[in-house]
Amino acid sequence: MTTVEHSSELDEEYPVLAEAVERLRHDGFVKLPGVLNPATIAAYEPEITRTLFERNTQTLPLEERSTYYKAFLQVTNMWPHSEAVRRFVFSARFAKIAADLLEVESVRLFADQGLYKEPGGGITPWHADQYHWPLSSDRSITVWVPLQGTSREMGPLSFAVGSHRLELGRNIEISDESEAAVQAALDAAGLEVEDGPYALGEVSYHLGWTFHHANPNRTDTPRKVMTIIYVDADVRVTPPVNPAHFGLLEHVIPGAKVGGLLDTPGNPVLWPPAAAS
């Protein structure tokens, strides 16, 4: 395991302007410039990458995978396996932004995910994350942190503007079917899609019911992304109603009790930070 010198930037506050909060309310997502400086990314990226490949279980070549598994290498809950990854995921900077944008006093960790879209990796089908989560509230948000500048050719995350306010596609798991059905619904609703590149250090936050997608990686460089999912600290676990819920309760939030707070050891409060120290 590589030793990574801790970056104080991860503990420092980032000013969240009222305009950003309003944009999240209206659009369902917001992109924030300069959340991390290049030195912080350069310090943590190698250990995040090492941990992802150490924990990765996908061994099939791209051409033999389903659409979903062509989208990226995905590893969930990396933080228990690396002290450097834990510091990155437990960042007070990221967590306070999440609380400010959600307009709640406190947020806890739901899960982290490394999402590495390989060279030649396919689309990430349209989907809304919260379909997969048995939660009592829609106060959930994900920070999407590219570990390099991300051009359109690499397949940056794209968002259907305002889709979190529409009752569409909320019963569809991420799949070929969700790609077709959600795209048709978005076209019918006339929603704009934001699919711009990300500068190095820029991140995005999106709500659990915001529909998002990514195009293929048409470059010869992996699109390396770390994500952290936050929920209102007062959220409760609801009875599972679809296969994704059952799998998540078993593998992602083990120990969570239906009807109870999501207060397992794997779901610490990250803002305010004293509870996570």
Kindly label every feature range from the protein language model.
Residues P134-R152, P197-Y198, Y205, I229-A233:
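Short, conserved beta-strand element in jelly-roll/cupin
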Residues T2-E5, E9, Q58-E63, I172, ...:
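Non-heme Fe(II)/2-oxoglutarate
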Residues T150-F211, N215, V235, A256:
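Double-stranded beta-helix
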Residues M1-H26, P33-W126, H132, N171-I172, ...:
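Non-heme Fe(II)-dependent double-stranded beta-helix
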Residues A128-D129, D176-G190, P222, V241-L248:
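Short, surface-exposed loop/helix-turn segments at secondary-structure junctions
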Residues D129-Y131, S140, H212-N217:
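Glycine-rich phosphate/pyrophosphate-binding beta-alpha loops
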Residues Q113, A128, V145-G149, V161, ...:
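Short, structured patches in soluble enzyme cores that scaffold and shape functional sites
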Residues V104-E105, Q130, L135-S136, L147-P156, ...:
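Active-site region of the double-stranded beta-helix
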